Design a protein with these regions (language model features):
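Hydrophobic anchor at the start of a short beta-strand
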Residues: 56, 130-132, 155
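Aromatic-lined carbohydrate-recognition surfaces of secreted/lumenal glycan-active proteins
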Residues: 128-142
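Histidine- and/or cysteine-centered catalytic micro-motif in compact active-site loops
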Residues: 61, 95, 137-139, 160
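Glycine-rich, charge-decorated loop segments at or immediately adjacent to ligand/cofactor-binding or catalytic sites
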Residues: 67-70, 142-148
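Functionally critical loop-and-helix segments that line ligand-binding/catalytic clefts
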Residues: 1-10, 15-18, 146-209
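Substrate-binding cleft of extracellular glycoside hydrolase catalytic domains
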Residues: 1-128
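Short, solvent-exposed loop/turn segments at secondary-structure junctions
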Residues: 99-101, 140-143
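Short His-Asn-centered micro-motif
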Residues: 9-10, 30, 135-137, 158
């Protein structure tokens, strides 16, 4: 199987881009969280990745206590043109709340949380004309999403093991695999370790994501 290397980052990471591993071809950057947070490093990362011609993507961290519309408005307010070359589809990060004790806001009504995610996806897809990438992990689908699936959306799975990730119910394949949350790469200065990713395809297939 052919994999393309990538990373995903936020303001918690600082990168010496001049030393970035040349095998890394795509970078997803945290853009927003909830109804009001915008990652303070996003604009700097976004513009630099453009100058380097790397594939670049933006993601939103879904919070259980804010409305889908408010969260979508926060993400869309960045004004990203998803029709531009090398711009990857929006990604929604559906996982444990921060801190994880806030997962109680999911478990008290899992169907409401599923609807929240679905509504965000629908709003953002209508606005951007791109299929949203779904990020989560297999156990989260089972424990918090009642094994609900979005089978027409690209799937990004977190699975920190040497073999390919197991698929959640309702999925036939994965598009991106986050295989490490504590990896190191050439170009890291400080700010914790990097999330390391594989894209399931060839470089030109990123244009079809």
């Amino acid at each position: 199987m052919s994999y393309i290397k990538g990373i995903d980052i936020s303001h918690n990471n600082t990168v010496n881009w001049s030393k970035l591993d040349p095998e890394i071809k795509f970078v997803y950057c945290k853009a927003t969280q909830g109804h009001g947070f915008k990652d303070p490093a996003f604009n700097t990362y976004w513009q630099y990745l453009k100058t380097k011609g790397l594939y670049r993507g933006a993601y939103h961290f879904l919070t259980a206590t804010d409305s889908a519309q408010d969260q979508a408005n926060n993400f869309l307010s960045l004004g990203i043109d998803f029709s531009k070359p090398n711009v990857l589809p929006p990604m929604i990060d559906i996982e444990d709340q921060v801190p994880a004790s806030l997962n109680v806001n999911i478990t008290k009504d899992k169907n409401a949380f599923i609807k929240l995610a679905t509504d965000w996806i629908n709003i953002v897809e209508a606005a951007t004309k791109r299929k949203v990438v779904i990020y989560s992990y297999k156990n989260f689908f089972a424990e918090y999403l009642n094994n609900h699936s979005w089978p027409t959306n690209p799937l990004w799975l977190a699975s920190y093991q040497p073999k390919e990730p197991g698929l959640p119910v309702g999925y036939k394949d994965w598009s991106i695999w986050q295989y490490s949350q504590d990896g190191t790469i050439d170009g890291k200065i400080h700010g914790g370790e990097f999330d390391l990713d594989y894209f399931n395809g060839k470089l030109q297939d990123l244009d079809k994501l």
